[in-house]
Amino acid sequence: MYKTNIVFNVLALALFSIFFASCTDMKDESDRGAHSERGALWFGPRLGKRSMKPSTEDNRQTFLRLLEAADALKFYYDQLPYERQADEPETKVTKKIIFTPKLGRSVAKPQTHESLEFIPRLGRRLSEDMPATPADQEMYQPDPEEMESRTRYFSPRLGRTMSFSPRLGRELSYDYPTKYRVARSVNKTMDN
């Protein structure tokens, strides 16, 4: 008797789940999907999820069409003039590989430094007698006079020197123009 009761309960549960799975018109009219009172329990379609649609044509037909298109593409490629066709890749190594320590530079090529116009910051140009790249000793050895003056007055942040440079492209200029131009406001505001 106990076994028949368990079988009956399992059967009733299966019928109940099949009934509710197949019944789609039981949706309440006031139910608005994710915006309902039970929004977290909405099991509607997920946005952006692709549905698995059964393919309408056989995969063999698709594969045959793809092969046919590739054959047509090769036919038209062979019709091109020889200059426009890509060369076939070489299968054998015919050149001796020369070791180059840095990209783009070979060992046999003499290194010459061309004088390029280098602008380190906007609005600033280097003078002709100043080299474009200073030597390492000049870069990493601070000026002794500058070090003494810095320690005497204040200690700026790391990497800062006492020579202050204003905003990029600007020089400190305290020459004010002699004539000023005064214009009226466009939006008709009045000063009281």
UniProtKB/Swiss-Prot annotation:
Proregion positions: 51-94, 171-192
Tissues expressed in: Expression is restricted to the subesophageal ganglion.
Superkingdom field: Eukaryota
GO MF entry, a single one: myostimulatory hormone activity
Signal peptide range: 1-23
Function: A hormone that controls sex pheromone production in females and pheromone responsiveness in male. Also mediates visceral muscle contractile activity (myotropic activity). Identical to MRCH which is implicated in the formation of both melanin in the cuticle and ommochrome in the epidermis of armyworm species. Diapause hormone (DH) is responsible for induction of embryonic diapause.
A GO BP annotation: pheromone biosynthetic process
This protein's name: PBAN-type neuropeptides
Residue ranges the record marks as coiled coil: none
Residues annotated with Leucine amide modification: 47, 103, 122, 158, 168
Organism: Bombyx mori (Silk moth)
Pfam families to which the protein is assigned, alphabetical: PBAN
Location in the cell: Secreted
